[in-house]
């Protein structure tokens, strides 16, 4: 297929190359079977030029796969294999591989080691105070609001109110959509700083630039090379560690987690006030 004078390569064409590779043939038959099942779930992008695939649409593709963590993980793995092969064949930019690696997966319980340590958070704060780099600002916003990377990109900036310390937004589950997300006192100046430059939701640049800048921030601060998902998990983990404890109902209303048991509790307690959420996030010392 010709595209602007250069030959494009479809997802299906590249996947055929993947199946002929030595690495693919070394995979056990059982695992290959799982991967083929995952590939069948990606039919909607078979004819797409690999180089044209965008983070937001691939995140939506993975989110839309039926099942919990493992089916979605297998689709992400196949996407990674396809894009890595395309990079080797020099038909798309190497930055595309990093985009796939940053696709977020649900449900599999994260552990405390996936949250930023106090030392890492201090390094991020130090970087913000020194550079005021936007990517560092996004990292701090996610750590104190529990927002997903995709939520930053999807956010309607008219629904961001630093003065009122609230963001109305969110994606994914019913619990996550259109929720009141509190803006902690300490990040109000950061939200005010990033909003004037917002072009892609709350973000100033596209996904490729975002992850490139993220990698530079990781290198600059010396913190572990975890994806930006860990900022959200840091918020969730540290809220659970507060003493006296913050109720699960309040935490889930901030984070936007969907949990049937918690949802029933929330219904019995009624709407969780913004003031209750602000009280919780203002107790965080990240």
Per-region residue spans from a language model:
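C-terminal catalytic core of tyrosine-transesterase DNA break-rejoin enzymes
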Residues: 70, 140, 144, 151, ...
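Conserved tyrosine-mediated DNA breakage-rejoining catalytic core shared by Y-recombinases
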Residues: 102, 145, 154-190
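Catalytic-site neighborhood detector that most strongly recognizes the C-terminal catalytic loop/helix
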Residues: 170-175, 255-286
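N-terminal core-binding DNA-recognition domain of tyrosine site-specific recombinases/integrases
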Residues: 4-12, 16-92, 110, 131, ...
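Short, polar N-cap/turn motifs at the start of nucleic acid-interacting alpha helices
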Residues: 159-163, 245-268
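Phosphate-coordinating loops and pocket residues in cytosolic domains that bind phosphorylated ligands
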Residues: 55, 126, 154, 162, ...
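Basic, Lys/Arg- and aromatic-enriched nucleic-acid-binding interface segment
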Residues: 69, 73-77, 88, 92-149, ...
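Active-site/catalytic core of tyrosine-dependent DNA strand-transfer enzymes
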Residues: 184-224, 235
């Amino acid at each position: 297929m010709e595209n602007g004078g250069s030959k494009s390569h479809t997802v299906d064409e590249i996947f055929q190359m993947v199946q002929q590779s030595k690495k693919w043939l070394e995979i056990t038959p059982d695992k290959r079977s799982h991967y083929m099942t995952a590939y069948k779930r990606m039919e909607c992008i078979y004819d797409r030029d690999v180089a044209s695939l965008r983070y937001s649409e691939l995140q939506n593709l993975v989110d839309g796969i039926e099942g919990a963590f493992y089916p979605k993980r297998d689709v992400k793995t196949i996407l990674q294999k396809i894009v890595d092969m395309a990079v080797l064949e020099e038909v798309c930019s190497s930055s595309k591989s990093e985009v796939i690696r940053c696709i977020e997966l649900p449900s599999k319980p994260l552990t405390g080691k996936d949250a930023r340590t106090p030392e890492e958070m201090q390094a991020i704060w130090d970087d913000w105070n020194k550079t005021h780099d936007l990517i560092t600002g996004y990292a701090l916003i996610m750590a104190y609001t529990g927002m997903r990377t995709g939520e930053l990109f999807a956010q309607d900036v008219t629904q961001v109110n630093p003065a009122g310390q609230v963001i109305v937004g969110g994606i994914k589950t019913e619990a996550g959509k259109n929720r009141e997300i509190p803006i902690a006192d300490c990040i109000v100046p950061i939200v005010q700083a990033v909003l004037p430059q917002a072009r892609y939701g709350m973000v100033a640049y596209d996904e490729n630039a975002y992850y490139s800048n993220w990698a530079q921030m990781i290198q600059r601060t010396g913190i572990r090379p975890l994806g930006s998902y860990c900022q959200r998990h840091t918020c969730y983990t540290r809220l659970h560690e507060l003493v006296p404890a913050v109720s699960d109902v309040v935490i889930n209303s901030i984070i936007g987690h969907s949990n049937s048991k918690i949802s029933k509790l929330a219904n019995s307690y009624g709407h969780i006030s913004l003031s209750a959420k602000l009280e919780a996030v203002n107790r965080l010392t990240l």
